[in-house]
From Swiss-Prot:
PANTHER family: ATP-DEPENDENT RNA HELICASE DBP3. PROSITE patterns: HELICASE_ATP_BIND_1, HELICASE_CTER, Q_MOTIF. SUPFAM superfamilies: P-loop containing nucleoside triphosphate hydrolases. GO terms for molecular function: ATP binding; ATP hydrolysis activity; RNA binding; RNA helicase activity; translation initiation factor activity. SMART domains: DEXDc, HELICc. The gene is TIF1. Its main location: cytoplasm. It comes from Mycosarcoma maydis. Residues 9-19 have a biased composition (Low complexity). One of its GO terms (cellular component) is cytoplasmic stress granule. It catalyses: ATP + H2O = ADP + phosphate + H(+). A motif (DEAD box) lies at residues 187-190. Transmembrane segments: none annotated. A motif (Q motif) lies at residues 38-66. This is ATP-dependent RNA helicase eIF4A.
Amino acid sequence: MSKPEDTSAAAAAPAGEAGNNLNIADGEIESNWETVIDNFDNMELKEELLRGVYAYGFERPSAIQARAIVPVIKGHDVIAQAQSGTGKTATFSIAILQRIDPSIKAVQALILAPTRELAQQIQKVVIALGDYMKIDCHACIGGTNVREDMAKLNEGAQVVVGTPGRVYDMINRRAFKTDQLKMFCLDEADEMLSRGFKDQMYEVFQLLPQDTQCVLLSATMPQEVLEVTKKFMRDPIRILVKRDELTLEGIKQFYVAVEKEDWKLDTLCDLYETVTITQAVIFCNTRRKVDWLTDKLTSREFTVSAMHGDMEQAQREVIMREFRSGSSRVLITTDLLARGIDVQQVSLVINYDLPSNRENYIHRIGRGGRFGRKGVAINFVTSDDVRMLRDIEQFYSTQIDEMPLNVADLI
């Protein structure tokens, strides 16, 4: 972890390793790790973990996953800079699950997150990916019962994800024992510092074993984050995934003006013949909407399948398998799974609801034309959505035109 500032590059440094001198331009780190493994099968993951990865719906690693999973598994300290929504959570979750020993009932990995919601989200991802591994992941967050927290930690969770204040409290009370800890991961480090958790982060760090591996993920690299990396890490591997690795190139984007929300359903039904030419993914913003739309379409005798985070893992696995094999042609889902559905055949994406944040737009539709395939994206836009549509156009420097009548010819 910690090391003197002037240490030169490690002798066995990977390609392009440049020690600890972080060259920063515009708040970006400079990568010193070039290896890209763009297939989960080639990462030498445990069989049960690989099963969990595919069951979750991942097909191919995202840019950050293809670069960062392996160095973390190898035990390097790693700084990864990537925008939110690029698959960072699964990056460290997969690496952690590969490194821990499920037979040891003690905390082996600690993940700190800036908010309770993010901590709980990470917990869900770890549990889902580790579904076949018999591991326990506990969320150690404020606003919950301290006694219950202590009891849970006593039961021997191998992974703890939490907010800095509560984690520090638990370690201090000796409820969270760190003697078996080998990995410390800071997610959204920039956000953590901007929320004033710096002192608490350092306090937690001081209580960890000296040789703990440290992994830090951040969308931006302000000076404060770099100071953290200097204090916590030795010869870190640095990985930068620029925003433009996710591209809208080759994807034709259209909008359909829908006068009011209630009319979207009829619009979709009118498009259904077009939709089923190939496979399509339809995105809604809430799980409830997914269920509602599925019911409505089914009652009109359209064949669709649906998937969201409330479903059992086994159920999601079956749906994903059917969709991948092509036996189900239309999948309705939420953003939770937007990043996992890399299905090669998908050439049409419909945003029944525009995403509630613009970053998710590229995760939904970038999928349609991934890996050099062409794709079409159709956005349903009510008068309330016009501003968001313009915002998306500006953010991605792209143009979204009104859908032509011959859209079927373009798919």
